[in-house]
Amino acid sequence: MEAAICELTWHEARNFRKEGDLCLAFGSGKYKFEVVEGWFKPPKGWHFGWIPAVACDLQGRVFVYSRSEHPLVILDSDGNFIDEWGVGILKDAHGIWIDAEGNVYCTERNNHCVFKFNPKGKLVMTLGTPGKPAEREGEPFNAPTDTVTVKPNNGNAPIAALFVSDGYRNFRVHKFTPDGQLIKSWGRQGSGPGEFNLPHCVRVDRYNRVWVCDRENRRIQIFDLEGNYLTEWRNLLRPNSLFFDPHDDVVYIAELEHRVSIWTLDGELIASWGGGKPNERAGEFLGGPHGIWVDAHGNLYVSEVLVNGRIQKFVRV
């Protein structure tokens, strides 16, 4: 499937500015958002490097996963510090996922593993050997990028499973049982169907289709739960991550080339902003959107790489 391309400039994509305050709104139609300036309020004296990933649980907590001395920081919805996890464990943040039970999966790129924490922050499972890449080509893991879970109550999924995109050097997607037993893998380096040039994120929609951000091929590939190729969206701006609206057939995409875009699951672009030059203005993107999540209230969170400590909250209006 050939996805439509947005060519809006920042001035065209911006919908309005509130006089008397500094809120800017972005998007269009049903999907308009105001950026909340100064939302991220870490403890005084804490410094953050790149923030590759962000996620929200059903309690409204926001998990900020960064490459810093405080790798996994938990905030309330107003950006205030609650807790931190993973000090001494998490070494190289990349992707994050929170399942329906509140378990948190942290994918460590150059640590070559996935850590699973329970909702209270206890480490309960490790996939891979921390610090050691796979000994054989194609086996898990060699610079993995992201993780997602699917359970029988997600549509009509026949079994529970866990998928990991792997990643910078393996060009594979792996499917595991919930307790971490490898079921199968697929993919190889290339640009054809089922081939990857950096599988950067993996997610599963409500129709049990596996979506993989094939970043350096500038596309998203879509598979069934067994890894059979279904279709693809081309001509994206190097997609880093995606998130499915839990209430509607809509997908949010974070694209490295300074854009956030919102699409129907049929590939129709319905809103976007950014996509031009780096911009430090609130609501725009200075480094590159890398992590994306929508909370239970429809608020959007976007974290960036290639710049230190940048994460933004957008409130649905």
Positions of PLM-derived features:
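Eukaryotic scaffold repeat domains enriched in small/polar residues
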Residues: 6-8, 13-317
